[in-house]
A protein has these predicted regions:
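Extracytoplasmic metal-acquisition and chelation regions
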Residues: 1-155
Length: 155
């Protein structure tokens, strides 16, 4: 608006419309994710979902943390596998930024503890958008993530 004052009203109106779309998406997400029973635990490949978990009251655990180069120790992975098996978490998630082998290794560790955890078919979008239509916008990726988590964990 400062760079193009003659169109300021249009920019501000568009911003308000977009904010309303965000509020509506969050409200819908609140309703969908509220259906997840305890344990309300989200396991992903990257801790980028901590903000998501905090807002939607989900405990978030990741196989990678801080960055895609920072890996968990073998003990931390074993502890996470124990948590998943003991809480009978049904599904863990790959995301578009993390090492898929870490999630697959975690799944194997959980299986060794006697629990059949699934890896979701729906990849989550962390820290970036997808290239495909539907996940190539903030709202599209957000809605996709909400739907994937709700479908996998709200059973």
């Amino acid at each position: 608006a400062e760079a193009d004052p003659k169109n300021e009203k249009t920019y501000r109106a568009n911003a308000e419309k977009y904010k309303e779309k965000i509020r509506a998406a969050v409200s819908e997400a609140d309703a969908k994710l509220a259906k997840i029973d305890a344990p309300r635990i989200l396991v992903t490949g990257h801790d980028a979902f901590n903000y998501f978990g905090k807002h939607f009251d989900l405990e978030v655990h990741a196989t990678d943390f801080i960055s895609t180069e920072a890996k968990r120790s073998a003990k931390e992975i074993d502890d996470l596998a124990t948590l998943i098996a003991s809480k009978k978490i049904p599904t863990i998630f790959l995301d578009n930024q993390a090492n898929p082998q870490a999630i697959k290794s975690l799944q194997e560790a959980v299986h060794a503890k006697g629990w059949d955890v699934k890896i979701s078919d729906a990849e989550l979008y962390a820290d970036s958008l997808g290239a495909e239509p539907g996940v190539d916008t903030y709202l599209g990726a957000f809605t996709h993530n909400v739907d994937a988590v709700a479908e996998a964990l709200a059973k």
